[in-house]
Design a protein with these regions (language model features):
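Hydrophobic alpha-helical segments within soluble ligand-binding/sensing domains
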Residues: 42-81, 136-137, 161
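A short, well-structured beta->alpha microelement
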Residues: 1-2, 105-119
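Short, conserved loop/helix-junction motifs that constitute active-site signature segments
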Residues: 29-35, 74-75, 148-152
């Protein structure tokens, strides 16, 4: 609190852990900042009361709409697999959007917390959320190759947060 008058604005990207204790602590701190000085960037915190500035992405609607562009291809797959941790920032919004999209379009969906050989099955599609340093994508492709599956022919991968390394991995 002693620093609240030191700056004209506080620009915060609220990518905090989603567990209840962390969120409670973060909300307590953020509510101390006067609304006129607070600007949230990239992620909206619906739990934070007040009339503060915010510029954010609507991850849920963007994901839902993006999946719609691939609906025809998704309908050819027997299951939509999402690999993520429930504590990830993207799980809360993108995971919900994937569930809603699959329900609305009658597509089987399954959530996983890790990539194991058992979840890699032919004619299925995979989405990896929060893949740190693309390790999740690398692991998925490595395990698929061990099973003699080719990406694009035997399994499909939806890239979230596209990066140049995908060109090499895939």
């Amino acid at each position: 609190e002693e620093n609240l008058d030191l700056f004209d604005y506080y620009v915060i990207t609220p990518h905090f852990p989603l567990d209840a204790a962390s969120q409670k602590r973060v909300l307590k701190i953020l509510t101390r900042i006067p609304n006129r000085k607070l600007i949230l960037v990239d992620h909206w915190m619906k739990e934070l009361p007040g009339n503060y500035g915010a510029v954010y992405q609507d991850f849920a609607n963007d994901a839902y709409e993006g999946l719609g562009y691939g609906l025809k291809k998704l309908k050819t797959c027997s299951r939509f697999n999402v690999v993520t941790l429930p504590s990830s920032l993207y799980y809360a919004s993108v995971g919900e959007a994937v569930e809603r999209f699959c329900r609305d379009n009658d597509i089987a969906v399954e959530f996983h917390t890790e990539i194991t050989p058992e979840i890699i099955r032919e004619k299925e599609v995979y989405l990896i959320l929060n893949s740190q340093y693309d390790l999740g994508l690398i692991e998925l492709v490595r395990r698929a190759r061990e099973l003699n599956f080719r990406v694009g022919r035997d399994i499909s991968i939806i890239s979230y947060n596209e990066s140049p390394i995908n060109e090499i991995i895939l």
